[in-house]
């Protein structure tokens, strides 16, 4: 390839570009498309870790007119970003049941792959601890991204000590053993949102969102675009000191 340079400025620009590419090793790469993400689950989850949960929620609403966010009751108990594939457990009341009745909630942990998110629904469970320190330790050791419990949790000081992200409806010292029966790998309704095994679950300080697995790649690409637009607006707003002008220019609020 022959390059025609017409000025000293052009030479400087060309040398600078070459230095960035060859010496710095920084070359802009095109962002993967939905098809690429759909074919690579690890890439998909890694990308979901870097988008804001609010943008994921907006993407689902704009693309499918679908509510995907869990009620504000489900909030961070042990802070941290969550992004992974749902492993689901339903806990139903079974007063006086044998301890073995909750064995499936343990099996769900021990058979789950890395980057899973433990999603448990405890029937009338605001005053029942669905998980505690032992279960969180096992999840953490197996590489879970975090846990989302429609119910209570306990051993909170330890959850924070090991920095394992947990979102739940509250904190309570009780146990489910002897009071509940567990079923694993079934669709559940957590915080008002239907979650099936393998769906994408993301959570941050803004809340929790579940994305159906068959549309997860498309939703991700839309969320990335929304993130990019919003982040571009911050400096524009600060410079012009006008929200209205920024909204007119970027078309996002």
Give the label of every model feature segment:
Residues 207-209:
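Channel- or pocket-lining gating/hinge segments that regulate access to a cavity or pore
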Residues 12-24:
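Bacterial N-terminal signal peptides
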Residues 1, 26-28:
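Intrinsic low-complexity/disordered segments
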């Amino acid at each position: 390839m022959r390059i025609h340079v017409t000025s000293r400025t052009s030479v400087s620009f060309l040398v600078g570009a070459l230095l960035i590419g060859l010496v710095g090793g920084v070359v802009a790469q095109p962002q993967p498309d939905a098809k690429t993400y759909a074919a690579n689950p690890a890439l998909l989850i890694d990308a979901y870790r870097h988008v804001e949960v609010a943008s994921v929620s907006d993407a689902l609403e704009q693309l499918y007119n679908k509510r995907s966010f869990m009620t504000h009751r489900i909030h961070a108990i042990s802070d941290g970003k969550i992004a992974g594939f749902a492993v689901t457990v339903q806990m139903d009341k079974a007063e006086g049941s044998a301890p073995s009745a909750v064995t499936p909630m343990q099996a769900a942990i021990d058979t789950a792959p890395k980057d899973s998110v433990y999603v448990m629904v405890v029937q009338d469970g605001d005053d029942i601890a669905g998980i505690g320190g032992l279960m969180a330790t096992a999840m953490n050791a197996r590489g879970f991204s975090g846990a989302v419990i429609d119910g209570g949790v306990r051993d909170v000081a330890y959850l924070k000590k090991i920095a394992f992200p947990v979102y739940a409806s509250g904190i309570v010292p009780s146990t489910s053993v002897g009071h509940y029966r567990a079923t694993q790998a079934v669709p559940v309704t957590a915080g008002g949102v239907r979650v099936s095994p393998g769906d994408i679950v993301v959570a941050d300080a803004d809340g929790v969102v579940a994305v159906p697995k068959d549309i997860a790649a498309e939703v991700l690409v839309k969320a990335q675009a929304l993130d990019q637009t919003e982040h571009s607006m911050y400096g524009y707003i600060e410079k012009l000191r006008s929200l209205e002008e920024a909204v007119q220019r970027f078309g996002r609020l």
